[in-house]
């Protein structure tokens, strides 16, 4: 059996994988690139829970796996900032370079029609809200934001995927990668359930569902790694009008609060004006999430109070906890 040969194979078709393929093929159209994902194309990812509220333990899960990644059914918030929550681009580059990358990313989003009204809608009002928050001892972070909508994201992911196909990127779905055998720096063999694939380079970006597998690969090849902190929170739902004075100006306000008892820092996260609270099952765990559609609104809004937890010895591996 003749093995397929590529210049670059990308494992995982979430935002990292899709953007990597787009950048590679845009800068060098002659490259032979393939994307492998164990899930389905975005337009084929249908969760049975959306119809009868029952989880059938699909393998792989259509919510977590497939083109677009685990965020395909989120509400599509874009936060144009180099640092928020656990994410901090300035660990890897200076602030100017990070902001330039953010501008380039926004241009790609706009190229695919992923554009909407920018927040804050009124900077003067936003600064006044920030002042009022500061009086309470909390801190409001003002950043540029856009909201795309849960109902629109699969369409956008489909459009990105179609452009990659048009530019000769090989798009593979239902392709579960089991192992990578690295012979040397420029020769790798990818083992899937059905075949072996040869490639000069590999980009490993399997996302949330692939975290355990990546850790196993790192152990196999003695690649050092550290575990990031996890964030644990509760989702709160209120009548929409209670938050409108803020959310009409700042769509997803990030407010940092120091707790009185232990001095822990918590923050608001993932605000969904006129949104919906949804039950989600992650393997044996049942959680709640929130999202907001572009065209259909509820009478409620929801948000999360979230706290960062960093584990210490002897239990430092946060992967098993989220």
Protein language model regions, located:
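Dinucleotide-binding Rossmann-like beta1-alpha1 core, especially the glycine-rich loop
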Residues: 66-119
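Residues forming the flavin
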Residues: 2-82, 124-322
